């Protein structure tokens, strides 16, 4: 598509069920790859679009990470209900139903560091994971950020460890939040704080609830009981609008 131009026009019509938002991307420069993956007995198409500059990273990892994320999240919540999941290489991370935008590029010579690779894998897991929270379990992210970002970051942590049990997860492990929790009390806020008033937004809306859920699963309730309850929450509130009492 980069070799020639056409003056002809074409109309594409897309139809999606049970979505609350949408996005699309178009470029003559994008590389596309895809793979079918079995998610809880259903075939889903995992796809990636990326610029040539991102080829060394995205060609090797992106679509595989998309497929892995769908399987991991589906095992911990409900089966992924959509027919496709798409990762698009971009300047930063953002999520929409069935499509998300993620960062990470190789150097001009095609090499990349472990930090860049792991950052790309982590953001793809996180943004694809947003299909489940808040696109499927449709909480109000403007009112209760932790129900969206916190639960998603917790599932991201589990998916990262299932991808590689030595993955350097930044949010989820208990020891990673110690420095934040040692900060002066006037810089700490309850998780239930309204989204628009949160200071230290990343640690409070992402890391603190993710870490709390991890501790609840590993230390307090145990995996079997926690996993049953977490899956039941997702099942009950799929395509509905839960508030904090519904989770508790």
Name what the model sees in each region.
Residues 1-64, 77, 121:
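Non-catalytic architectural context of zinc metalloproteases
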């Amino acid at each position: 598509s980069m070799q020639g131009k056409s003056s002809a026009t074409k109309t594409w019509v897309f139809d999606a069920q049970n979505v609350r938002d949408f996005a699309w991307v178009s470029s003559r420069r994008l590389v596309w790859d895809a793979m079918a993956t079995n998610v809880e007995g259903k075939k889903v198409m995992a796809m990636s679009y990326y610029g040539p500059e991102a080829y060394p990273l995205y060609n090797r990892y992106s679509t595989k990470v998309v497929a892995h994320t769908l399987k991991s999240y589906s095992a911990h919540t409900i089966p992924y209900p959509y027919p496709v999941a798409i990762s698009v290489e971009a300047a930063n991370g953002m999520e929409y139903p069935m499509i998300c935008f993620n960062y990470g590029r190789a150097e001009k010579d095609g090499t990349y560091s472990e930090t860049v690779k792991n950052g790309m894998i982590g953001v793809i897991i996180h943004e694809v994971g947003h299909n489940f929270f808040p696109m499927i379990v449709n909480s109000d992210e403007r009112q209760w950020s932790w129900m969206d970002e916190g639960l998603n970051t917790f599932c991201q942590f589990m998916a990262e460890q299932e991808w590689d049990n030595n993955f350097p997860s930044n949010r989820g492990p208990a020891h990673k939040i110690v420095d934040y929790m040692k900060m002066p009390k006037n810089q700490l806020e309850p998780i239930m704080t309204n989204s628009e008033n949160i200071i230290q937004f990343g640690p409070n809306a992402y890391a603190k609830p993710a870490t709390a859920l991890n501790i609840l699963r590993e230390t307090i309730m145990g995996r079997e009981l926690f996993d049953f309850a977490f899956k039941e929450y997702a099942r009950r509130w799929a395509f509905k609008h839960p508030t904090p009492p519904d989770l508790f």
